């Protein structure tokens, strides 16, 4: 098993690869931060669902993500793009006044704040800044 330096970026890459291959499900290693990010994705309508899987034979948990497709033939992903902003080597922070707007408000920024993980809209409403984790549109 390989060591993953940035598990959030790994999750995004797995999702992008699954979308490019038109897969409906993708499985990845579990972490609490990934679950919080996926809760935001589900709430904002970027994925259909996700669930945490436990295996009796192993102590490792996994997350199964059900991707969301739209359009006449259900062939266009609800996710057009994902960008990891703050990385382990370069953290990006933003004050509440300077929170980024993704595609003039049509996308979502995920912000890690003192109140937990929030979307850019929720962080503006709560008047808190924090680490800019990712953009999704």
Swiss-Prot record:
Q: Hey, which family's this protein in?
A: Belongs to the universal ribosomal protein uS8 family.
The protein's matches in Gene3D superfamilies, at most eight in alphabetical order, are given as: 3.30.1370.30, 3.30.1490.10
What InterPro entries does the record point to? Ribosomal_uS8, Ribosomal_uS8_CS, Ribosomal_uS8_sf
Q: Name one GO molecular function term.
A: structural constituent of ribosome
Any one Pfam family match given in the protein's UniProt record, by short name: Ribosomal_S8
PANTHER family given in the database record: 40S RIBOSOMAL PROTEIN S15A
Q: What is this protein called?
A: Small ribosomal subunit protein uS8
One GO cellular-component annotation of the UniProt record comes to:
ribosome
Q: Kindly list the cysteine pairs connected by disulfide bridges.
A: none
What does the entry give for GO biological process?
A: translation
Q: Which SUPFAM superfamilies match?
A: Ribosomal protein S8
Q: How does it assemble?
A: Part of the 30S ribosomal subunit. Contacts proteins S5 and S12.
**Species per Swiss-Prot/TrEMBL record:** Metamycoplasma arthritidis (strain 158L3-1) (Mycoplasma arthritidis)
**Role this protein plays:** One of the primary rRNA binding proteins, it binds directly to 16S rRNA central domain where it helps coordinate assembly of the platform of the 30S subunit.
Give the HAMAP family listed for this entry: Ribosomal_uS8_B
Keywords, ordered alphabetically = Ribonucleoprotein, Ribosomal protein, RNA-binding, rRNA-binding
